[in-house]
Amino acid sequence: MVLRELLSRTEQIDDLCHLFGALGFQAAWEHVPPGPWLGTGPAEAAGVVRAALVARHDVFRVFALEARDPERAVRAAAQRLAAHAERGLACALGAAPRRLLCAGWRAAARGPAIRVAAIPLERPPGSSLETLERFSPRPRETALALSLRVGEALASEAVTPRFFRAFRATLERLTDRLSTPRSRAERHTLALTAFTRVLFLYFVQAKGWLDGDRRYLIRRFDDCVAARRPFHRRVLDPLCFGALNRPAADRSGAARALGRLPFLNGGLFEPTALERRHGAARWSNSDWRDAFDDLLERFHFSARETEGGDAVAPDMLGRVFEGVMDPAERRASGSYYTPAALVREIVRAGLEAVLVHRLGLAPAAAERWIHRGQPPERAPDLRRLTVLDPAVGSGAFLLGALEELTGLRCAAGEGPACAVRRDVVAHSLFGVDLSLTAVRLAEVRLWLALIADVSAGPDDPELARIAPLPNLDGHVRQGDALVDPLTLARALGGAPAPATPASELERLSSARRKLFGLAGAAKRDALAGLARAEAGLARELLRAAVAALERRSAELVAAAKDRDLFGRRRGLTADTRALLRRLRASRRELRAAAARLEREGGAPFFAFESHFGDVLARGGFDLVAGNPPWVRGERVPARVREALATRYATWRPARGRGFAHLPDLAVAFVERALELAAPGGSAALLVPAKLASSGYAEPLRRRLAEGACIERLAPSLAAGGAFAAAVYPMVLVTTRAEPTGREQVATALGARSTTPLIPQRALAGDGPWILARDAVRVARHLGARCVRVGERWRPQLGVKTGADDVFLSAQPGPATRPAVRGRDVGPWRATPRVHLLWTHAPDGRPLARLPPALAAALAPHLDRLGRRSDYRAGPAWQLFRTALAYAPCRVVWPDLARRLAAVVPDPEIVPLNTVYGIATREPDDAYALAALFNSRWLTALARLHADPARGGFRRFNARVVRALPLPPASPSVWRVLAEQGRRGESDDDAIADLYQLDAADRRALAAAPDPL
């Protein structure tokens, strides 16, 4: 507090004596003539009015300058100190905004490096105060040692992408230093576990809780280096496993020698199963020196999620989690960091729906409480409100729910905030994730949230009575929220979950509550009690599921043995035979799980009914919120796809012409979220925006529109840049309740009374959800009155090679044709940038024998070409989907573009498989379609139905173009359109007249260029 007050009172350089005196320097005041000291040129250039020596430590001197350009002045002074190899610091005061500028120098390979730090004088963040504190001289410290430390403090960086790169590089280096276990994935997990502990210690250290020293770890490390002792064995091991995880009275002498340290409980500070199996991972002093220099001491740490962007705050653990995953792993898991501001708005939207539908508040009262902090006169009790994140990631949504529920309860009169926050974690928050790393990071963020506002300072005698960190083992679990063997077995067997005795459910709930606040031997007993409660529920659930599978199998066999009217046995159809195989496989899996339960004593896998059965018995969770994985169905393993199709009614391939796209994994998560929500409860999810338009999501859209209340359907286009996935996000908030037909859907986040609304009934029926109401009216009117493109022509994809590196060349050759990708096509233009080895005859069939030059080029690749996924039979050099390549008349457009952009290409040009096209019999048809497709009206209509992608792009695939209306046009009018196409122009007004669009229709389409 002293530093904050001194900074706020600093008005002129004379006041810096008091500031540096408070830091432990010897105060001084000696005038220094600016010109002779700095040099006339630098002094005049910076506008230095006066300079003075204001503090010293040994021969380390602190100078203050008053100047017109304060940053230029301190840089000049630091350069002067460096030129004379003097130890010191230069300071100046800046205005607008008021700030203290400090500059120093440190030796570098290419000469002295000048470092400048700017410290706000009003409301300085914790990171700035830490920088000042790092200037403090230590007892008996030499000027050289102080100068080196000041240089390190000035070199500390604000958080930039460099932090995340440095984190990943450090983690990879620590992983590579380990020799065991053999699996690199396990070594990576061990390194991440240990490094997560150190990160947590840096956050705790920032509060001054490690022996009152905000520089505790680096000082202990320096002491170990000076004494030639291993830092990991002498400090980290006893700190984590002998001090922080034990009450002070139970610590060994070595642990007590580490200083005054709080008891933070086990959890993070106890060996994991992997560490118990392979032994704790340890690194040398050299490895830790690199970690300190490259990462830990380079950036500021703050235990507050809301700390300014110049500090490493706990919410960055989400981005760290995303950063330590390589891109292929991230795409496979669909795990993406969600920005905190977006999380807050999604959680608020979900809680607002819960307050209205689950707890009975009036909409206006719920909005005031959520968005203005004004509780109703009789506020409902939120102490048992439950929130689940079924794909918890790094815990962003649980943290968001923690802050919002704490705020609501404190606004209603509960307090203090730290006690309410702990109670929310104890009773309201639950999470699941497949990744153990994600579970650990979520726990760390929840623990940090609990200590962030604890007021005990480093010298506070209450430090010893800081509440130990709670045990979250019963709240955040590793497991599969979508498909566990029990729910899959019930889907196959067609049996509901059995009723569970209330005594068993109370035993589970009581065990979780008891475990939350215990430590030591009592904690171990409570953990065993929780495991027994979960195992007891799992045992009965497994028994009932096996019985259901056996009944269903017996029914199928009995039906197969039944005889028809002619006395013949009916037998098993192919479908029933496949179902019987899966029933028996599921039964084997459950029996093996039951045997493992009896052998090992714990539940063999995570299931909501066994681990959170007490919550489900009350109907379910009040709010299910999160950012579930976005994974294209084609990337999901075949066995998992089969399970999803069995388990979820809405997870079905798109039906229609052409390739049947598999649903995104997010489809199943939406259905699952509503299952887990209690009646009147809500699901608030961040999902791919393409769920509103893709054909594969139509069963889900129909189910939501007809069987639930849709509260929000809000495209988050503004968040697309901050969001790292490859498609636009959309916020979907639904309530588990039957719609009445009067529901209104908000199409934006924020206070509901200020957002645009559309009737939910407008979302019913087939087709995409379109939020631009006036444009929808125009589109439906045209659809009812006009013939569609798909009724006359068939849009199709261009040529697919299956081996672009073999068939495509930058240079033309005797056996090549110019080719275009989607990015090479625009309105009225197709610019070939590659050339395709052409292996087909003019009629489209593959050549039976290749010309010698072509045969020689392809000969080394024939085995590979025969293994392409599209290859079935015939010459190995054949290409696929060649119809557009040899069609004499065709119009083509890119699959991915900001607008529908069409061209009639030269006959020699081959469209590749990121280009769609239509082959026509007559050239006039191709040119007329180009004129229509390039008009603003067809682009607007196409964008209404096209799936969104990043950067404002849309996917203008065959489904979208098939549905476009064709204007009623006589042959003469069609010829006029064709002439426009030949000239490379579209007459928007004339085309609007052809469609009979009045002024209101044109305004509606013009106003909705990007409706979703």
Name each model feature, range by range.
Residues 484-605, 617-623, 635, 639:
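Basic, amphipathic N-terminal segments
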Residues 139-205, 219, 281-424, 438, ...:
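Class I S-adenosyl-L-methionine
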